[in-house]
A protein has these predicted regions:
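Exposed acidic/Ser/Thr-rich ligand/metal-binding surfaces
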Residues: 20, 31, 112-332, 387-390, ...
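Long, acidic serine/threonine- and proline-rich intrinsically disordered regions
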Residues: 55-58, 62, 70-77, 331, ...
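Positively charged n-region of N-terminal signal peptides that target proteins for export
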Residues: 1-6
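Acidic/polar low-complexity segments with low predicted structural confidence
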Residues: 46-128
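C-terminal motif of bacterial Sec signal peptides marking the signal peptidase cleavage site
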Residues: 15-18
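Acidic, Ser/Thr- and Gly-enriched intrinsically disordered low-complexity segments
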Residues: 81-98, 107, 328, 338-340, ...
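Short, low-complexity, disordered segments immediately C-terminal to signal peptides
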Residues: 20-38
Length: 488
């Protein structure tokens, strides 16, 4: 009955969309329109240059740095819900894919395990789609190492809005509620000057920590702050050998935290990660978000970048995925996909525009690649064209290489081989392809071919919708885009 009601709602919504004029009548791949509603968007994003098809004769190997960042999806969700224009570079397909949880398991002794699947490409039936999913080993919270956290919090005047400091306070109180008694917490704020509000309190002092966070108020400029230096000093002061030592930087995008040039800030953070102190970034608010800088700094600090647009998202980051958010299991994680040149004619990596590595970088154990948190699944999709299809022939070989974060062992690797095409792709493959297809439509990709919003919706409905709140929310987001953007 529940599924019947959902389908009925879909039919009604699609009927409304179908009755609209122009290119929206088919629910097809129309480019994003620009709604009049919403504030001016001064957000900044990394430039994402769409990748072209590459012949396997020229190069049959693609190397990618993996990580668990997924902030682009949260930001995209807020843009659509607020009826704001959608910049092309705001549509980061790999972060959209990596936002969701998947049912892959890792029962091996390795920290990372890969899954390969090849099936027909939904938006171009002349091609095929390869899914490379890398699953990190799960850890229970009680198995986690002790934590030493420094909260570096932006309380400048621009943080006054409800979706900035007030939401940040609620989010970090969620994190505090989940601390273990032997964890250590310090708090540094920055505005006109930096202030140390808490110096190495224990996780057992939750009431004290929460009270300090609750009392934060926004005001002043950010000139002259040395907040980032203070944060790392405290992290080093309370450093836990064998523990998880991390700075959490939360801001609406103002990075005047003591080092005026982003290059200097990146260098400083990179040097500090060598001491075992990592950095995670949390973006709040809209209109001033520097997603490009936050992505760059997170990578430099062996951490991830999250965008928190709601209390629900804060709960996802700090409760549902807490173990993965706090516990890195694989450092410098990278994947190499090698195609059989006798079978695969050409290929195109979808997303990961700024995460590709050379063969030399993949082989070099000193290459700075991504970090994967416990239980996380990182997904790469590659569209491929086949020459000939030979039964049970090797199509692709995948090598995952990383350093074990628990024992820092170098060059651990796992190899997976894919033989043949599946006629009945898994529900995970179907959902991943739906997310990617929506991304291609939003980007108005020249490779979207026959991508269709209607097909995206159908695939989601058939993909165990009732079992996952976040996938249900994604469906609602696609429908809202169809109704509020396409109909215009």
């Amino acid at each position: 009955m529940k599924k019947f009601k959902i389908l009925l709602c879909l039919i009604l919504v699609l009927t409304l969309v179908g009755c609209s004029s122009g290119g929206a009548t088919s629910g097809g791949a129309v480019p994003p329109q620009k709604p009049e509603a919403g504030d001016a968007d001064n957000n900044e994003y990394l430039e994402l240059r769409e990748q072209n098809f590459i012949s396997t004769v020229a190069d049959n190997i693609v190397n990618v740095s993996l990580d668990s960042s997924n902030a682009a999806y949260s930001n995209l969700r807020k843009l659509i819900n607020n009826l704001q224009p959608i910049p092309t570079d705001a549509v980061n397909i790999e972060q959209m894919l990596n936002y969701f949880t998947y049912s892959y398991e890792n029962d091996s002794e390795d920290q990372l395990k890969s899954y390969l699947e090849v099936a027909r490409c939904p938006w171009n039936d002349e091609n095929y789609l390869l899914s490379v999913a890398v699953k990190a080993k799960e850890f229970q919270l009680e198995e986690n190492r002790p934590n030493n956290f420094v909260f570096l919090l932006d309380i400048s005047g621009s943080m006054y809005a409800e979706d900035r400091l007030p939401l940040m306070i609620k989010a970090f109180k969620i994190l505090v509620d989940n601390l273990k008694d032997n964890d250590r917490v310090s708090i540094v704020t920055y505005a006109g000057t930096e202030s140390i509000l808490l110096d190495g309190a224990y996780g057992s002092e939750k009431a004290k920590i929460s009270a300090i966070i609750s009392d934060l108020s926004a005001g002043g400029s950010t000139a002259g702050s040395k907040g980032i230096q203070r944060a790392y000093e405290l992290a080093q002061k309370h450093y836990i050998e064998g523990g998880n030592n991390r700075v959490f930087l939360a801001t609406d995008g103002d990075f005047n935290v003591g080092l005026s040039k982003i290059g200097d800030l990146k260098k400083f953070i990179s040097e500090k990660r060598q001491t075992g102190v990592y950095l995670s970034l949390f973006g709040f608010g809209t209109g001033n978000l520097k997603a490009d800088t936050m992505d760059t700094l997170a990578q430099a600090g062996n951490g991830n970048y999250y965008y928190i647009d709601s209390l629900l998202e804060a709960q996802k980051v700090f409760i549902t995925e807490l173990g993965g958010t706090l516990q890195t299991v694989a450092k410098d994680a990278k994947v190499q996909v090698e195609f059989n040149k006798e079978i695969v004619e050409k290929y195109r990596l979808i997303g990961y525009e700024n995460k590709q590595l050379t063969d030399e970088e993949f082989d070099n154990s000193e290459t700075d690649a991504g970090e994967i948190g416990a239980g996380h699944v990182t997904v790469c999709l590659i569209e491929i064209t086949l020459k000939d299809l030979v039964d049970d022939a090797e199509i692709v070989r995948c090598t995952v290489r990383y350093k074990d974060a628990l024992d820092n062992e170098l060059n651990k690797e796992a190899i997976t081989i894919c033989n043949g095409i599946t006629a009945n792709p898994s529900s995970e493959f179907l959902f991943q392809s739906a997310v990617a297809e929506f991304g291609l439509i939003l980007r108005n990709s020249k490779y979207k071919h026959n991508a269709s919003l209607s097909k995206v919706v159908s695939r989601i409905v058939d993909n165990k919708l009732d079992s996952d709140d976040y996938r249900r929310e994604f469906l609602q987001l696609v429908l809202k885009y169809m109704n509020d953007y396409v109909r215009r």
